[in-house]
Amino acid sequence: MTKITVVGAGSWGTALAMVLADNGHDVRIWGNRSELMDEINTKHENSRYLPGITLPSTIVAYSSLEEALVDVNVVLLVVPTKAYREVLQDMKKYVAGPTTWIHASKGIEPGTSKRISEVIEEEIPEDLIKDVVVLSGPSHAEEVGLRQATTVTSAAKRMEAAEEVQDLFMNSYFRVYTNPDIVGVELGGALKNIIALAAGITDGLGLGDNAKAALMTRGLTEIARLGRKMGGNPLTFAGLTGMGDLIVTCTSVHSRNWRAGNMLGKGHSLEEVLESMGMVVEGVRTTKAAHELAEKMEVEMPITAALYDVLFNGNNVKDAVGSLMGRVRKHEVEAIPDLL
């Protein structure tokens, strides 16, 4: 039995805490809403973020980060990307020794455009890091909460670390593969949120299956193009954290990025969308970060650029579609010869 603290009591953090508790681990979960932590402890439910799911009674919730981290050497981080540095700066005051830092957040840090594993390594002293591991893949919290079959990937620079995390999570409904490509796994999970927003817009506009299939396929090309430029393995983007996560996020009503895009496609403003969602829509921030990375690294990402103009420059969604369809003619694979 391993002592694990889950930092972040949203839908995904709560669902992963349930998986770990089902596997017999000593699981604690931290959140900054004391009333929510009380509900988890007394009613064994997170009615705000994972309603209708009865959680294992062995999960203990804390609103004090210091108390949640006592005698723990494995932490699972599931917080919004913009909150990572602040949370990590608090955590390092209470972590006692070498710790395995797992993160399951899908995004890029706003402002720096850094991957989350890079942020962890910057903020946490070396003597407090045993390993940094990424857990990512096609996985809706609502389905994991119902214990429906789900498959994800554990990635780390040291394969033994990825395998240790694989063993922590594996059970009859939650299967984990390993991958040494931490860069590709992180980028696949983050960048697919951009395409999910665009897919939602496509559906909101009623453009049909042909357009959505084209968007997803060309979107994957953009993900792989930037990912390869940043050092990711091209094969990773054809796997669970690339194509797999893209499919589930672009086609399901569970996806908050798809839902946000759908509202944009139906004519709502970005402000209206974000206010109505009530939860973080990582794709919005990731679009800005990816657009900045693409310009800096001179990588062609036309879908990302068009979405950036819709979100941040006030462009009309129909005009964005027209601009993409009117681009100069190209061979399908001419832009990614280094991936073949």
Swiss-Prot record:
The active site is at K192 (proton acceptor). Sn-glycerol 3-phosphate binds at K106, G137, S139, K192, D245, S255, R256, N257. Its main location: cytoplasm. NADPH binds at S11, W12, R33, K106, A141, R256, V280, E282. Pathway: Membrane lipid metabolism; glycerophospholipid metabolism. Coiled coil: none annotated. This is Glycerol-3-phosphate dehydrogenase [NAD(P)+]. The gene is gpsA.
